[in-house]
Amino acid sequence: TLAIEQARAAKIAFSPPMTEIEATYAVPKDSKITKVAEVDAPGIRISVPEKAGYELYLTRTIKNATLIKSKGTPAAVELFTKKGADALGGLRPALLDTLPQMPDARLLEGNFMTVNHGLGTPRAGRTGAGADYLKAFVDEMVASGFIARSIEKNGVKGLAAVAPKKP
C-alpha cells in the first residue's frame, strides 16, 4: 500500500483509502504535555525525520513550536532521547515499536494527522481500466470487512481500516 498524497496523485491513480494510520507524539513521561494540541507551543522542540509525510504536514501547520529535522527515524529518536527534544513526531505503529528503546517516554492519545493508504497504478499512458479495477477491488475489500479482519488477525497496532461506504 501507499500513502495517498496530493504530490503523488499527479503520477499515480489511487484507489479509495483502505487503511488509515495516526501520526502522534511521544513525550517524556514527566512532561506537562498531555494533549496533542499542547505540543505546538513556544519553546517546544519537536524532533521529526525529514521528508516523512507527517514532517511535511507539521512544516505547514506548526505555528509556535520549533521543528528539528533529522536524517531518518533513528536520528530523530536519538535527538529526542539523548539531546532533549520535547516531543518526537511519528506514526503511531512506529512509535509503539520504538517505545522499548525510550523507557522514559509515553505516547499522547489522539493524533495531529492521519495518513490514508491505498493501492495505486501509474497514470501515464493508461486507459483507466487499472484504476477502475483497483477502486472496485478496494471498495469490496473494505465493505466485506476483509481489511479490518486482516489488521486484527495480524495484531497490527495503530492501523485502522477505513469505515465502509454507506450505500
At which residue positions do the language-model features occur?
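Short active-site oxyanion
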Residues: P42-I46, A85, A136-F137
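Acidic, polar ligand-binding/catalytic clefts
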Residues: T1-E38, R106-F112
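Solvent-exposed, polar/charged alpha-helical surfaces in well-ordered, non-transmembrane soluble domains
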Residues: A37, L56-R60, P74-K82, P93-D97, ...
